[in-house]
Amino acid sequence: MIFENTDFRQEVLDLHSPYDVKLVQSFLKKYNFDFLSEDVDYTMILYNLNGNLIGTGSHKGKILKYVVVEQQYRESSAFAQIVTHLTDILLQHEKYVFVFTLPANIVIFEGIGFKHIASAPPLFSVLEFGYKSITDYVDYLLRIQRDTHTDNIAAMVVNCNPFTNGHLFLIEKAASESELLYLFVVEEEHSAFPFDIRWKLIENGIAHLKNVVMVKGGEYIVSGSIFPSYFLKNEEISLVSQKQAELDVNIFANYVVPTLQIKKRYIGTENLCKTTAAYNKAMHEILPKHNVEVIEIKRKAIGMCGDVPNFISASKVRQAIRENNIMSVIEFLPESTANFLLSNDSWEIRQKIKKSDSRH
């Protein structure tokens, strides 16, 4: 498909054409990008009127990627044309568009209407554009905020894939030490258990805790929209995890903390997942600067597994489901989760887990 304007000609790339893909790969390689067609849903390319390729841009989901314009055209309308084309397409079915770029490029995107959300210097910043924004999420937080006269207010973020007695232990611990606990549930649909199921299992499992307010994580709390691993492909994976964590924690510190007057954030000790360990490290480094105490709780274990404690883990539950041996981890499960997994209502999820080797 070809579009024309007075200065440039743009085309939609055929991601199934080896020739088209190689064309963009060669162009982006000059700028140290390794373009992979499977990393994007849509790509457009921009030519000058002499037929020379001078720019390109893509998107994956609601995230803009690989937006590059030749140096000599960066003062022209080429950059704005690419970004406007991509955002127009995305906003036909999305409420948000996100872009990750170097902090030095913030002003360029702000010049075409994007709003800066947070940075993890010196490597990248995240900006957004659309019908919805982080201001709408702050408004949501204000609507669910509970009136209180205490400053003993805590927060915790959970995924619960699925909800286990380990999660329940951490939540009960935080609730017992706080007057009010805001429990953020990751809303991203990249887990084996869909968000609505995870929410319901948690809600049923903590019904006895009257000082806990459940909160939807939205686009800004451990969301795929805020994890730009594609942007740092040439960096060490430890640095990727570190910068993603900093971005997430900075958003929490700058928007959630002042809105809900959070004074404490509870986390579980992480022994297995390096990415989660990086989040914990970032919280310890960043949140105290915002007058938020980070309280790390040792995870709950049931007996021993050889010479080490048998820590309760959602991944162990999913593995037991794969092996059709849910009873081997029944002690890991609160009543709400056990009843669900032993019912026909969970059949589709159990089949999905059995067919997948994903750690999520």
Language-model features: where?
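Nucleotidyltransferase catalytic core that binds NTPs
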Residues: T101-H360
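Short, well-ordered alpha-helix to beta-strand connector turns
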Residues: V40-Y42, E94, S178, I262
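Conserved beta-strand in the GNAT
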Residues: T43-I45, G51-V68
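Conserved acetyl-CoA-binding loop-helix of GNAT-fold acetyltransferases
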Residues: E75-D88, H167-E172
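Short amphipathic alpha-helix that is part of the acyltransferase structural core
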Residues: M1-F35
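Conserved GNAT acetyl-CoA-binding A-motif
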Residues: I89-P103
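Beta-strand-enriched, solvent-exposed domains that form extended recognition/catalytic surfaces
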Residues: V24, H59, D88-Q92
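A short, internal acetyl-CoA/4′-phosphopantetheine-binding micro-motif in the GNAT/acyltransferase core
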Residues: V67-S76
